[in-house]
């Protein structure tokens, strides 16, 4: 029976290897050139997450389904003794120590030491004596065990996403002690079952526990992928986070490379000139995200095509823009544009006329856009009129930070060039003072006002994906020529793991 079980386990491993080979991803000769997003987790982060390993192992033990264990043996004077261990359940599980090591180009080695567990169930046994005397008994049992567990997790690419293979799993038993109910059974019976049940039990425990651990590792990998996929999706706009190359395991970090192409209706996105190189990321922080300039450009294009780059300003907000200073030029501009009408009866509409262009530089994120501004007045009881229409090419450099769970965008430089300028009260356009005031106003308060609308919108979007649940420490957003890096440390939110276990198990 054990030989047959070993053969089945061996065949299962062979089939698993064939499945992995069949599901392996194919990549081009230059995978870095098509890499839009890179995720790097360093060893300190792996050590932090390893502290949660105990909960995953406990879940594996408790969720494992143990089959009934049956066997028989011929005994002198007793005849054939048959037994069944049924309704096996785990209780009182404790883990003394868990260690993790990253084995370069191989696996994540997790060594779990001194796992103490009690397996409880019902033992039914019977034997036919030499004088045809048949006796059958049923008694509750408890098995006290002390186990070391070694799991070697390999990271693979399956169906263009990261998959975890934890099939390389070993159990070492330091103790396996059988207790029968109240220890009232004869000592020879206890010794008998301890001797020839233990080997079978070890085999079954290893098979079922390792199977459950491997399943949980795969479910966890899928869960992480789904969370990441949801994080980069907002309504019709999303990112394709398919792998651009096989995931890496290095001595000090784990790393995955993703395409990051924008998904939006019929929008066609192609990346072939990424500047990523592993040397661009260090190992001093827990987590790193490398993002190509191309990704931000494509996201801005999708937002434009989706009609999101539109803003209406009215009432007190509009008044604050036009009265940010009290000068003769300001008073003249307000009089010419609004003609004595109230700000409450006026609306300024701002929108992009063409696809924005984004470039990443050491100074920050440079956004260049052709923008239209239209001020409409709705006098009570009269026909609405367009008081001002202008088009300008605006280039603004923005520096970003993440502080107290909020995204902060700070404009540090801007350039404004008027392309079209039509003021109803000055059709000739000869009054340069109005144009000069508007240019100053747009630079001083107009651009900050637009950015102040973007900040909470993006913060709210990220929080809706659960970012605020993480305790992020000292995050930095660093821009370089054609790419940016987000680097941070973090504390793991325990409730997220519990939520995962509740939903999946």
From Swiss-Prot:
Listed A to Z, the keywords are: Cholesterol metabolism, Disulfide bond, Glycoprotein, Lipid metabolism, Lipid transport, Secreted, Signal, Steroid metabolism, Sterol metabolism, Transport
Matching entries from Pfam families are given as: LBP_BPI_CETP (PF01273), LBP_BPI_CETP_C (PF02886)
- Record's GO cellular component terms: extracellular space; high-density lipoprotein particle
**SUPFAM superfamilies in the record:** Bactericidal permeability-increasing protein, BPI
Q: Which residues are glycosylated?
A: 68, 114, 266, 344, 422
Query: CDD domains, alphabetically?
Result: BPI1
- This protein's major location comes to secreted
Location in the cell reads: Secreted
- What is the designated name of this protein? Cholesteryl ester transfer protein
Record lineage:
Eukaryota, Metazoa, Chordata, Craniata, Vertebrata
């Amino acid at each position: 029976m054990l030989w047959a079980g070993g053969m089945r386990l061996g065949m299962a491993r062979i089939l698993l290897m064939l499945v992995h080979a069949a599901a392996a991803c194919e990549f081009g000769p230059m995978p870095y050139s098509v890499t839009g997003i890179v995720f790097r987790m360093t060893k300190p982060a792996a050590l932090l997450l390893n502290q949660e390993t105990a909960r995953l192992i406990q879940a594996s033990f408790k969720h494992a389904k143990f089959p009934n264990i049956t066997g028989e043996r011929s005994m002198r004077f007793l005849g054939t003794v048959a037994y069944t261990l049924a309704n096996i359940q785990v209780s009182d599980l404790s883990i003394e120590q868990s260690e993790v090591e990253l084995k370069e180009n191989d696996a994540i080695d997790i060594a779990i030491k001194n796992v103490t567990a009690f397996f409880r169930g019902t033992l039914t046994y019977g034997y036919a004596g030499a004088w045809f005397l048949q006796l059958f008994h049923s008694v509750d049992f408890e098995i006290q065990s002390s186990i070391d567990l070694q799991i070697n997790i390999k990271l693979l690419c399956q169906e263009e996403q990261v998959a975890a293979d934890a099939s390389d799993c070993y159990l070492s038993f330091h103790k396996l002690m059988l207790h029968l109910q109240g220890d009232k059974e004869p000592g020879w019976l206890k010794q008998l079952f301890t001797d020839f049940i233990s080997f079978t039990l070890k085999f079954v425990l290893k098979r079922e526990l390792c199977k459950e651990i491997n399943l949980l590792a795969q479910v966890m990998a899928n869960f992480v992928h789904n969370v990441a996929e949801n994080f980069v999706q907002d309504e019709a706009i999303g990112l394709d986070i398919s792998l651009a190359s096989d995931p890496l395991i290095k001595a000090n970090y784990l790393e995955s490379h993703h395409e990051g192409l924008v998904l939006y209706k019929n929008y066609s996105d192609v990346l072939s000139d990424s500047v990523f190189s592993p040397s661009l990321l260090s190992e001093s922080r827990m987590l790193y995200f490398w993002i190509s300039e191309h990704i931000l450009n494509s996201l801005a294009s999708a937002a434009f095509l989706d009609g999101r780059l539109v803003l209406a300003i009215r009432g007190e907000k509009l008044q604050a823009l036009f009265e940010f200073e009290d000068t003769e030029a300001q008073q003249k501009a307000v009089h010419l544009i609004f003609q004595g009408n109230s700000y409450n009866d006026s609306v300024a509409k701002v929108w992009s006329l063409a696809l924005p262009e984004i470039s990443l530089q050491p100074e920050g994120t440079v956004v260049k856009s052709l923008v239209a501004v239209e001020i409409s007045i709705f006098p009570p009881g009269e026909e609405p009129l367009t008081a001002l229409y202008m088009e300008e090419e605006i280039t603004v450099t923005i520096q970003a930070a993440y502080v107290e769970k909020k995204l902060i965008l700070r404009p540090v430089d801007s350039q404004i060039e008027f392309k079209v300028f039509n003021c109803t009260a000055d059709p000739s356009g000869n009054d340069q003072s109005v144009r000069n005031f508007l240019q100053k106003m747009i630079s001083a308060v107009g651009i900050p006002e637009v950015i102040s609308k973007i900040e909470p919108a993006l913060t709210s979007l990220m929080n809706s994906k659960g970012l605020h649940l993480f305790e992020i420490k000292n995050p930095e957003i660093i821009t370089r020529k054609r790419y940016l890096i987000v680097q941070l440390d973090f504390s793991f939110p325990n409730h997220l793991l519990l939520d995962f276990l509740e939903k999946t198990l």
